[in-house]
């Protein structure tokens, strides 16, 4: 198997960054923002930029992704010839001096060198399933199909999102940027409700260009805030469900 050169890897990383930037631009559209929220519900443990990469490379069809080894551990083998999707991983190592001792910063904390290697993930449609294996997402949906829509559930999720994201805002801050903060809370509630199998037709997501002013940086920040809060809530729900 031919290994790529450093220049080829750097070029591919730049291509991925270009895909991320393109994805951010698309999030200005409210329908695309809602599609992003749907993806966060499926891939809440991934960073917002990797969610955009999965959205882009799967053309909106990915339902559950994992690396080659992860699929193998689940008893499922990736089909030969499948190329998968490229996302950005995370790696770090301790920086040492010439004597092998860990280097520290001015506060005495160990210094780590961080880099973001390209990793490949495959959608579940790209594998040969083990018939004994049941998809964890399918288990969740099966367990929650009987849930009926309830306004109090929507309110609880919305207010929980506010607590996670906005509890420490300075006085007067909420009023200045109410559109952003309400969008964050409603987006998180939408993701969690959809994950739980609740009816999400009653959820109203504000016009993105209205609250963002067209700022790509603000859209990125909001996308990550929403993902983090949704991950916290869904992880808590998963833990509670499995106990």
Task: Describe each PLM feature range.
Residues 1-243:
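N-terminal accessory/interface modules of nucleic-acid-binding and processing proteins
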